[in-house]
Amino acid sequence: MLIIKNGHIVDPMNKTDGVFDIAAEGAVIREIGKDLPCTAKDNVIDAAGCYVVPGLIDHHAHVQPLAKIGLPTEASCFASGVTTVVDAGSTGCANYIYHQGILERLRVNVQAYLNVCTTGLDSLPGCLEDVNPAHWDRAGIKECFDRFGKKAGGRLVGLKLRTSAPIVKELGYKVLEETVKLGEELGVSVMVHCTNPPGPLADLLKILRKGDTITHMYMNIGPDLIDEKGEVIKEAWEARERGVYFEAADARAHFGIPVAQAAIAQGFLPDFIATDTTKLSMNLRPTAFSMAMQIAKYTALGIPFEKVIECATMNPARQLGLLDSAGSLTAGHPADIAVFRPVDMETVHGDRPYGAENQHTIVGHRVYQPVLTVKNGEMVYRDVTF
């Protein structure tokens, strides 16, 4: 039995916030409580001074083998406390099927959005994907969801569209309208990338339904979340009211510190905090870097640590339909656990890579060092100092 003792457990789903022990037996959580008994046969780890949280869910990344530019899935996820990752549309209906066997062998739980482009993002970084609805393989998309969608017990959770002006071109928001219409026909949600949109962000938000996700919510390329008065646009509040999810997934350029500061000051916080990392952006300072660094950045921006953990555990688990298997530390559920050591140090967080134009930075004073990751009761990452 694995017993993690004396850690400060933060579990928003169960409203746990305090120092407790947690025991995992086999692949599941057995018990959480004070001063749990242990024997010489148990693997006992002292987590005093550390936070113990549910295994993180990175709701937006691009991972191998689904993406040519994908990050190394297990190595990058486990080293940052991530036990569930969502690939955000790296593949389309022509190539998703060929990766099923590999996904089944990964210990990380990989969920995925299916790109409306038949070949997904395979053309990147050389050229942009073709999202013209006239070129969609609608029958192929339907077949993918029939075979591999959540209703069939698979990993596909919805449709993905990047609606940047250079991608949709003269079609503008018609592509998003058609994507949402297709999502309605298939009974799935839509994730839309909004950086550099082809028109006012307000018009984009009006198209989205309850359960859809707008990602890169704090981007600052093209029309953004903040109006000329410095206020969050009313259409964003209206979209949230009707159940649209807002995701902060920042990558190297899908984030603007002034936009985030203004929105957070007005109480417009993310539903999900993710990375949108690839092998081109993982571990790159001063941008998204990893989920651990995203936690540090958003706490530096003024969001309480407990709320940030909610945005990286319970909230995405609910949206993905995984509350019975991820996003909480619940007895009888899979033992997916992450342990972070708070380290007080100055860290620069930026919204563009070093040397880029129009870069803004802030200085944070605390980072959260991943020291232990447990997946299904197995220690899959442990820092040498822990």
Where are these regions (language model features)?
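His/Asp/Glu-enriched, well-ordered alpha-helical/loop segment
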Residues: 259-343
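Metal-cofactor-binding active-site regions of metalloenzymes
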Residues: 80-86, 90-91, 105-132, 160
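Acidic (Asp/Glu)-rich catalytic clusters
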Residues: 100-107, 143-153, 204-209, 237-238, ...
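Histidine-rich, glycine-flanked metal-binding segment
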Residues: 1-53
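Active-site core of metal-dependent hydrolases
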Residues: 163-284
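C-terminal cap of metal-dependent C-N hydrolases
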Residues: 334-386
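Metal-associated gating/positioning segment near the N- to mid-region
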Residues: 46-105
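Divalent metal-coordination and catalytic microenvironments
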Residues: 7, 27, 49, 60, ...
